């Protein structure tokens, strides 16, 4: 899979922290996020899913993710926003790849992307969460165009 290395700025994000099988929690988290953003007129810039665990190593019921929108620095969570958290996605160097997701199969492009990054002789994965940025509304369009981000650092040597 083709990808590029990009320097990303830290993002301020607001949304929901979810624990459990991603095929359930990501969908549920985005449903909650949409209701919150629409109901409070939140000025959302980007829609992201942030992944903290390796599904090959962590049991499905313990997988952690955040479903969030980027907001301006200094954003204040409005009253009556139960469960909403304000946090950051770290900046730094990231491998970035694009994919079109059909039939809700987000795993295949991620596995392809990880395989490509693991084979890279100049870059290695850094110990930071991965995330994906949504470029369209897949519920309306029937597919999702996404950008996938894996934190990287130069290999020693």
Swiss-Prot record:
One of its GO terms (molecular function) is DNA topoisomerase type II (double strand cut, ATP-hydrolyzing) inhibitor activity. Coiled coil: none annotated. Signal peptide: none annotated. The keyword Cytoplasm applies. It comes from the Bacteria. It is found in: Cytoplasm. Keywords: Cytoplasm, Stress response. The keyword Cytoplasm applies. It holds the Pfam family GyrI-like. One of its GO terms (cellular component) is cytoplasm. Gene3D superfamilies: Regulatory factor, effector binding domain. Interacts with DNA gyrase. Inhibits the supercoiling activity of DNA gyrase. Acts by inhibiting DNA gyrase at an early step, prior to (or at the step of) binding of DNA by the gyrase. It protects cells against toxins that target DNA gyrase, by inhibiting activity of these toxins and reducing the formation of lethal double-strand breaks in the cell. Belongs to the DNA gyrase inhibitor family. NCBIfam families: PRK10016.1. This is DNA gyrase inhibitor. It comes from Enterobacter lignolyticus (strain SCF1).
């Amino acid at each position: 899979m083709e990808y590029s290395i990009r320097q990303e700025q830290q993002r301020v994000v607001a949304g929901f922290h979810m624990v459990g099988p991603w095929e359930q929690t990501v969908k549920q988290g985005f449903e909650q996020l949409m209701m919150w953003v629409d109901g409070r007129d939140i000025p959302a810039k980007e829609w992201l899913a942030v992944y903290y665990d390796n599904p090959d190593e962590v049991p499905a019921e313990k997988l952690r993710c955040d479903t969030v929108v980027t907001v301006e620095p200094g954003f204040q969570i409005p009253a009556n926003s139960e469960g909403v958290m304000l946090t950051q996605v770290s900046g730094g160097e990231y491998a970035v790849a694009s994919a079109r997701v059909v039939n809700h199969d987000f795993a295949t492009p991620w596995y392809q992307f990880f395989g490509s990054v693991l084979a890279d002789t100049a870059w290695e994965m850094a110990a930071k969460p991965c995330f994906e940025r949504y470029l369209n509304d897949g519920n309306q369009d029937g597919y999702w165009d996404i950008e996938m981000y894996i934190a990287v650092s130069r290999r020693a040597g």
